[in-house]
Amino acid sequence: STLLASSAASDVYKRQMDDIIDLELEKVEQIIEKIAADPEDLDVRRVELELWKKIREMARKGRRTGLGITAEGDMLAALGLRYGTQEAIDFAVEVQKTLAVEAYRASVKMAAERGAFPVYDAAKEKDNPMIARIREADPELYAEMEKTGRRNIAMLTIAPTGTTSLMSQTTSGIEPVFRTVYKRRRKINPSDKDTHVDYEDETGEKFQEYNVYHHNFVKWLEANGYDTSKL
């Protein structure tokens, strides 16, 4: 997994993320314009038009974004920590704490450069549990946030990242390894070369099964002298 780095080079990425939010707002604006220009009767398209106007309003007010992680299970395994043990939990807590504090720090710094999100009000959120944790973890950061605000109403999202993790061949989100080995199916044309039918669904579609080995499990086997050519 990759943590937000507190370095000069990371400022480029902070600005890029902020620019991406602006691009998303522009897309919402384009959708509203398209609906407004639709020749269909206004009464028919009013619900859709008002919905997107509300989305635009809330997006502008909060500039919400979501910074998360994936491959935590692989990270713990690489460090020799067993998922679910107290040692692994304590380490994962520190990772999440670092992620949260640095995300808030980046947003506060961006607010000083480009302005806080429009509805920021330090007094209204002073008793918020998340803000209280940031205040406890870094009092100086909290004091700076009270003065300048922050760029985003929310910054952290821990998503399942299922498809992304399949693509990157890592464990998913903050979850452990699903399985070191499991079977998947792919749809086939039975007349194709080197195929065989392992499963046929109720519509007659035919599938071939194949083994999937967790990518980093294979690397572990290789590092420990196992012959992976026989997998």
Where are these regions (language model features)?
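Catalytic alpha/beta core of large soluble enzyme barrels
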Residues: S1, M17-E33, D41, I131, ...
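Internal maturation/activation junctions in enzymes
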Residues: D11-R56, R60, R82-T161, Q169
